[in-house]
């Protein structure tokens, strides 16, 4: 099967959608299919051989974050040429209503289209306003996937119709095999608390965690906060309370191998996000690596954590509740071991062996619905 995967977001900056598309492409290639990815990317950005650049992206505020998107006539020509040259059996477009490469690919598509919706935003005025203009294009989508119930509700609320829920996939074996590093491991007197996310994006929750750490340090003076992610380290350091700054190490972005080792090392991984999350791929990565997880009680996070059975939760944007639970977990080695074990088991349900099979089932359903009347004979024979 020849599959064209389309990312709306730039591969210059790491993100959950980009990781999902990259890993899906590699999973499909590993199964013997031919997969190619089209995504925005600056010139000179190192890209896997199967990723093709649609040109430089522009940062735009979107869903409480800054997304790097790509749009315009020149990009539209590149998209059309990539689709024609790829001779794909099927296009799998991610976030097809975002004004970027995905929407352009939807307009240019002539083959069957599967779309994955990642965004969770039930009050999107932009989506409501754009729906009448997008409706003819949306009718070209033969199969809809939402990465969570929250994303599915966003689709049904603003775009009509429905979508099958298939979560983001994670190579859980990669994280499970990670070896802890001594410099990131804690001791009873100096436990380590891990944060992973863009440090200058408020919805990732670092300010909430920093406030909570003030109380944590009063109870456990030797506690260390290890922060991983892109953003201005000097600016982030300056925003931290003085006592918290002294206990914080800003590690910057890490390679995939080091990220897995980081998650395998910390005593507790904290996800203090404040909103705008439809899934929570980093929670799955942390669980797969064996980190006990403490996350804000966003609906998407609670579902990933199996209703709280695979990780602990605290009241979103409540640093006092976060501090109380974090201190309790850091002081209880038995509970940490239980959270780690339950998290590892839960993470396996998001492995690519499971998720990939569900996505392929959607592909087959869409292609079978088009054959034999609309699919060229060569493609039916080679599938």
Predicted regions: what is each one?
Residues 41, 150, 169:
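Carbohydrate-associated surface elements
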Residues 321, 335-349, 358-361:
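A short, well-ordered alpha-helix in the C-terminal region of glycosyltransferases
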């Amino acid at each position: 099967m020849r599959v064209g995967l389309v990312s709306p977001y730039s591969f210059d900056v790491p993100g959950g959608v980009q990781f999902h598309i990259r890993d899906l492409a590699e999973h499909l290639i590993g199964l013997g299919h031919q997969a190619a990815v089209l995504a925005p990317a600056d010139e000179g950005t190192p890209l896997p051989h199967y990723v093709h650049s649609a040109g430089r992206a522009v940062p735009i505020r979107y869903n409480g974050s800054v997304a790097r998107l790509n749009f315009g006539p020149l990009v539209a020509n590149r998209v059309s040429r990539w689709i024609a040259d790829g001779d794909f059996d099927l296009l799998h477009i991610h976030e097809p209503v975002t004004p970027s490469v995905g929407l352009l690919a939807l307009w240019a598509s002539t083959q069957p289209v599967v779309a994955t919706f990642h965004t969770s935003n039930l009050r999107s005025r932009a989506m409501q306003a754009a729906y009448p203009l997008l409706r003819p294009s949306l009718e070209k989508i033969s199969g809809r996937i939402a990465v969570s119930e929250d994303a599915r509700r966003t689709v049904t609320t603003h775009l009509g119709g429905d979508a099958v829920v298939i979560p983001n996939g994670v190579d859980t074996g990669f994280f499970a095999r990670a070896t802890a590093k001594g410099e990131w491991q804690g001791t009873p007197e100096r436990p380590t608390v891990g944060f992973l996310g863009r440090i200058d994006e408020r919805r990732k929750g670092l300010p909430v965690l920093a406030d909570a750490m003030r109380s944590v340090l009063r109870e456990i003076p030797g506690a260390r906060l290890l922060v991983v992610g892109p953003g201005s380290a000097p600016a982030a350091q300056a925003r931290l309370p003085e006592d918290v700054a002294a206990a914080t190490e800003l590690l910057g972005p890490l390679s995939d191998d080091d990220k897995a080792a980081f998650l395998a090392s910390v005593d507790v991984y904290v996800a203090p996000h404040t909103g705008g999350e439809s899934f929570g791929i980093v929670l799955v990565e942390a669980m797969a690596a064996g980190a006990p997880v403490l996350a804000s009680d966003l609906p998407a996070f609670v579902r990933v954590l199996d209703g709280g059975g695979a990780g602990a939760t605290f009241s979103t944007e409540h640093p006092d509740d976060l501090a109380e639970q974090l201190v309790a977990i850091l002081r209880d080695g038995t509970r940490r071991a239980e959270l780690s074990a339950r998290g590892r088991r839960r993470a396996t349900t998001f492995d690519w062996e499971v998720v990939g099979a569900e996505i392929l089932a959607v592909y087959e359903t869409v292609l079978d619905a088009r054959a034999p009347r609309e699919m060229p004979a060569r493609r039916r024979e080679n599938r």
